[in-house]
Amino acid sequence: GHNVGGWKYLSKQIIHQECHQKHIVFGMVDDKDIDSVMELLPKDAIYYWSQATTHRAIPSQVVAQKGLAHGLVGRVYDSVESAYMAALAIAVPNDFVFIGGSSYIVSDLLACLATPKE
């Protein structure tokens, strides 16, 4: 989900996801309605605010400030990879980890996962 229409559908699925804790790695780009999307996000999740590598990315600090204004709690990360790794480090087996907000966030994660680590 990278726009309000997509999040109306997706947020219902995330909210009803059976799990111990929801972890959401989230970032958006500057041509999307971030406030309307954040109104749809679950309040009971832990957020990992991030930004994609595109020049269109909203800085993760700004995303975090918007999140806080909507009652969403999380920490700021300077890359999708660092946010994802933090979520995995905290998550336990019955938790749910979601990565999204923008297709660019997902793209950065896929690039990270495809890069061999030394």
Regions found by a protein language model. Give the residues of each.
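Active-site catalytic pocket residues across diverse enzymes, especially alpha/beta-hydrolases
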Residues: 14, 67, 91, 113-117
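Short glycine-/acidic-enriched loop or helix-start segments at secondary-structure transitions
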Residues: 7-8, 34-36, 59-60, 108-111
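Alpha-helix N-cap/helix-start capping motif
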Residues: 1-4, 81, 103
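Generic beta-sheet signal
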Residues: 22-24, 95-99
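C-terminal helical cap/extension that packs against the catalytic core
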Residues: 35-96
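Glycine/aspartate-rich loop-and-adjacent alpha/beta segment that forms the canonical ThDP
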Residues: 102-118
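Cofactor-binding loop segments of dinucleotide-utilizing enzymes, especially the Rossmann-like FAD-
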Residues: 26-30, 50-52, 101
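Nucleotide phosphate-binding/pyrophosphate-handling subdomain across enzymes
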Residues: 1-46
